[in-house]
Amino acid sequence: MAEDLDELLDEVESKFCTPDLLRRGMVEQPKGCGGGTHSSDRNQAKAKETLRSTETFKKEDDLDSLINEILEEPNLDKKPSKLKSKSSGNTSVRASIEGLGKSCSPVYLGGSSIPCGIGTNISWRACDHLRCIACDFLVVSYDDYMWDKSCDYLFFRNNMPEFHKLKAKLIKKKGTRAYACQCSWRTIEEVTDLQTDHQLRWVCGKH
């Protein structure tokens, strides 16, 4: 009788308490094989815990991604800086000032054989950007012409700067250059420093 009971227990144990079935948690363990605890319940609890952990990590990843996106977004309120360095700014200002033009120093008058341009101590060029500070007129010049001796202040006052009117007092002469504003006039043949003629109020208007 005892032997039959042992064989029955062995058969039950072999059927219901195999290691594969226990690992898979698919059957209920008899009390003799583990104290009556359900392996499937433990597996379900473990699966839920794993799922919660996965969801937590996913939320944390989403939060990190959101923070990174916020940090990477450009600040719309912040205007882009267009200021250059101090040195480059000074260079730009200096270039702008230089771009306004250069003045002759000294200022020369000259006949038609003297090239026009910016006069310097080593470059004798006749200034062709003259302005009179007395009448505030630009000084005109005509190559290979000279003024007639009958010219007077009223003639230039009434006819400047119309060439077709002024030519009534212009005489052809090769090598000379006729200068005039509304209040003064000169016929020049050689290079002449403007400072030597104290009656003229002409200055270089910059090139």
UniProtKB/Swiss-Prot annotation:
Residues 39-52 have a biased composition (Basic and acidic residues). The keyword Transcription regulation does not apply. Residues 26-52 are annotated as: Disordered. It is found in: Cytoplasm; Photoreceptor inner segment. GO terms for cellular component: ciliary base; cytoplasm; cytosol; photoreceptor inner segment. Changing R177W: In CORD16 and BBS21; does not affect interaction with FAM161A. Signal peptide: none annotated. Its main location: cytoplasm. It is linked to Cone-rod dystrophy 16: An inherited retinal dystrophy characterized by retinal pigment deposits visible on fundus examination, predominantly in the macular region, and initial loss of cone photoreceptors followed by rod degeneration. This leads to decreased visual acuity and sensitivity in the central visual field, followed by loss of peripheral vision. Severe loss of vision occurs earlier than in retinitis pigmentosa, due to cone photoreceptors degenerating at a higher rate than rod photoreceptors. Interacts (via N-terminus) with FAM161A (via central region); the interaction is direct. PANTHER family: CILIA- AND FLAGELLA-ASSOCIATED PROTEIN 418, PROTEIN C8ORF37. This is Cilia- and flagella-associated protein 418. It comes from Homo sapiens (Human). The gene is CFAP418.
